[in-house]
Amino acid sequence: MSQIFADRRAAVPARVISFCGAALAVWAGLAVQPAMAVDPPVDCGRALGLHFWSSASLISDQTPDGTLIGKPVVGRSLLSKSCKVPDDIKEDLSDNHDGEPVDIVLELGSNYKIRPQSYGHPGIVVDLPFGSTEETGIAIYIDFGSSPMQKVGERQWLYPQKGEVLFDVLTINGDNAEVRYQAIKVGPLKRPRKLVLSQFPNLFTYKWVFMRGTSQERVLAQGTIDTDVATSTIDLKTCRYTSQTVSLPIIQRSALTGVGTTLGMTDFQMPFWCYGWPKVSVYMSATKTQTGVDGVALPATGQAAGMASGVGVQLINGKTQQPVKLGLQGKIALPEAQQTESATFSLPMKAQYYQTSTSTSAGKLSVTYAVTLNYD
């Protein structure tokens, strides 16, 4: 029994070694076969879209994010009408694929940042180069007009119009497809100024993709799109008010002799800075006011113990010496904003205590007015 077992063990390794040797010989034979050469995509060159955008637009702090600005710029004939193909596929295209469609894919240039949201619009939003979007809150909105933007890859979209194989070249017929550009408000206005939208080099790379979505997919040709938007001026106008706290003098409760009593009038200045000669006005509002009396704000309900009651604060316009009407109906024009491009000025105001009830109590008093700038 032991001898038979030994013979079988000896035979097994011999077969294994022989089999491996044959397998190695076959592998070595496959390794020396040359790979088929594939030529790179043909360079179709640059396509320049030169457009004119003559409208001037006014943007302010109150312009909502997502607002499209001015008129859209429409670009057609953005792509080369025809392109050559790599030499290694010319004969196959001419013999077997004449007249077949070729997809055109646009890929956003690497120097352009896509915003994560398009603010309800069907296209894409792209930041301006050189950090301009962070300063101005303005970006560029791009879409394909009436055609949807079909995303086919990272930073890639399918151009609405197809090309086709014409013997051994690629061609595109007509100018039906379009790419539209428009400024869009996307953030706060940190640096007001005149913004001129101009050159956008290498905005897109366009690729002629043959048999896209199959195992034989291949980019046969490609080029770049430079967009030059001329005379596109956006006036980034703004006014800023610096929040402030105004302190009124301490008064004696005994001095409050009846509803309508006013005491402790205090002068102060409301500081403003405006840029770009805006036509602007300002108005004040308060959460809780005294019915039937202009300019009187009351303390918020639910204040801590020890706060005064039966008294509010009334605002007086320092120019007219009249109580300020609260809300939009009481807006005050600021003509000083239009005197220079960058204007710093103050609006004279006064504040005073105003007795609102026959029942009063001593303590601290705090009221808040909201200041709103309104651009005409």
Swiss-Prot record:
Q: Please list the disulfide bridges.
A: none
Q: For this UniProt entry, what's an example GO CC term? A: pilus
Q: Does the keyword Signal apply?
A: yes
Nuclease in keyword set: no
Which segment of the chain is annotated as a signal peptide?
Answer: 1-37
Query: What UniProt keywords are attached to this protein's entry?
Result: Signal
For this entry, the protein name equals Protein FhaE
BP terms from Gene Ontology: cell adhesion involved in single-species biofilm formation
Q: PANTHER family, from UniProt?
A: FIMBRIAL SUBUNIT ELFA, FIMBRIAL SUBUNIT ELFA-RELATED
